Amino acid sequence: MNKQQIDQYLERIGFSGPINHDGETLDRLIWAHISTVPFESLDLHEYGIVPSLNVDDLFEKFVIKKRGGYCFEQNTLFCQLLNDLGFPTYGTVVRLLRPGAPLFPYSHKGLVAEAEGKQWYCDVGFGGPGPKGVVEIRNGEQVVGGVTFRGTIRSDDFLIERKTDDGWVETMYFAPRPIEPVDFEPLNFYCALQPNSGFRLNRIVNLTLPNGSKALSDKHFTLRKGNVVIEKNVETPEELEDLLREEFGIDIHIPRWKKF
């Protein structure tokens, strides 16, 4: 991206202040992005489109049209931003973990950035209960976004666990080594079009808030602010378009030919 595009991107996510090459700045950039740009699967669910991972296309979608996307889109564009800001950054494949569930394939894109002579895991494209900021790739506990995580460097990979009331829960692991952008193309295609893809079958829109979240699951909207939870259902495409515009800043047309 050129300087004008970088400035537009930073304006889109509401980021201001100095760009210091340290973990704190990475943390602030991640928070600015995830609290502004929705995680969403609308192109896949509504239109059956395989999202483009071309940086120019992503810039148009995210910055100009003020849309969101899923991990391959979000982290591809954010990776470009970090590199252009002077943070050496590469994409890596991540295996997401869920307690009691069968083993998932490697199907998530995360980022590893360098700053202060250290490696940091960065992720603006995880719609689940992952870290909402940088995780230093080291052994031990770290507080990220008010949540305690634990990192473990293993022989072949790096494991991230999340602390809960019931103990430690394995969240994800990955090998901190670069994966070429072209290698994410088949993963993107698979996640977009395989018949049981949750992104294809479900309408998903999430946005992180300072003290809560907004989430749309199919036709059910949930707003969480502190201890307050507000829920409602949308019944028509028109209501859905209004909700997407008002709650997520997404202005799209919902197809009328599909069963709603």
Describe these PLM feature segments.
Residues 1-66:
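Secondary-structure boundary elements
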Residues 7, 79, 241-242:
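Short glycine-/small-residue-rich flexible loop motifs, especially phosphate/cofactor-binding loops
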Residues 12, 84, 246-247:
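Residues at alpha-helix termini
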Residues 3-13, 17, 35-38, 46, ...:
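His-Asp-centered catalytic microenvironments across diverse enzyme cores
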Residues 235-260:
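Generic C-terminus detector
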Residues 67-93, 111, 205:
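Cysteine-centered nucleophilic/redox motifs
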